[in-house]
Amino acid sequence: MTQETFTATTRVKRGLADMLKGGVIMDVVTPEQARIAEDAGASAVMALERVPADIRAQGGVARMSDPDLIEGIVNAVSIPVMAKARIGHFVEAQILESLGVDFIDESEVLSPADYVNHIDKWNFDVPFVCGATNLGEALRRITEGAAMIRSKGEAGTGDVSEAVKHLRTIRGEINRLRSMDEDQLYVAAKEIQAPYDLVREVAATGKLPVTLFVAGGVATPADAALVMQMGAEGVFVGSGIFKSGNPAARAAAIVKATTMYDDPAAIAEVSRGLGEAMVGINVADVPAPHRLAERGW
């Protein structure tokens, strides 16, 4: 790959992710749910066999979804479709690319296939989404070719606190870099185990070079507005919609709250009459070995 081709491919992949800014990406497990999400205004859907709450509850090894399920969802909607591959499982990613998905999420929600290496995302034409809990992790995924970063949160809990923590961590570390001189940036790059050129770029621009969404525990319109006000560029919602009492209404309300995140009166209005939110789990009650956000390095 020539430098010109590399630059153009990177620009295209990141541009596709940029088109989703300000939107909501929803987990769906059937074509019918995908159509509900599209009708509610979702900017994209994530096709998978089990939402994170069910993966957490049922345990076992969580793998890439059945190709028939993914193709059924791709054929059901006109908005972009994402699908998950296990960390390090480049063959699952190859399969997903062959199925024509629009984005691949190398996801800690599934059981890792490789505890040393993430997928080399430069080997694919399809853009990748990856999770991160801090700036170093985000920059390592970008170095591997990720076109979008999502702060991980703790998927399948309905507890937004970890999403808030990870977003604050990433943004706080970016702000810290901005106050450093060049010598300090070299040290910071070593500390966070990220390439110096990327660290310097982040320090100069005050943001990641790719789109930053938030995931993990967003369950209400207020949750979505919270992370948007904190600087997220969009929201992933997993179990919070289709594990709630009125999925269609909640999906539409979260989309509206994500768009009107700085209008409390509008958020209050869309929060009315949504029925019961998902019951969820307090992250503090989840033992460390069972926390999905700990997967990845």
Curated annotation (Swiss-Prot):
Catalytic activity: aldehydo-D-ribose 5-phosphate + D-glyceraldehyde 3-phosphate + L-glutamine = pyridoxal 5'-phosphate + L-glutamate + phosphate + 3 H2O + H(+)
Keywords, alphabetical: Lyase, Pyridoxal phosphate, Schiff base
Annotated pathway: Cofactor biosynthesis; pyridoxal 5'-phosphate biosynthesis
InterPro entries: Aldolase_TIM, PdxS/SNZ, PdxS/SNZ_N, RibuloseP-bd_barrel
GO molecular function list: pyridoxal 5'-phosphate synthase (glutamine hydrolysing) activity
Gene3D superfamilies xref list: Aldolase class I
Active site: K84
Binding site for D-ribose 5-phosphate: D27, G156, G217, G238, S239
GO BP terms, alphabetized: amino acid metabolic process; pyridoxal phosphate biosynthetic process; pyridoxine biosynthetic process
Annotated EC: 4.3.3.6
Taxonomy, superkingdom: Bacteria
HAMAP family, A to Z: PdxS
Family the entry assigns: Belongs to the PdxS/SNZ family.
Entry protein name: Pyridoxal 5'-phosphate synthase subunit PdxS
Species per Swiss-Prot/TrEMBL record: Corynebacterium diphtheriae (strain ATCC 700971 / NCTC 13129 / Biotype gravis)
Protein's gene: pdxS
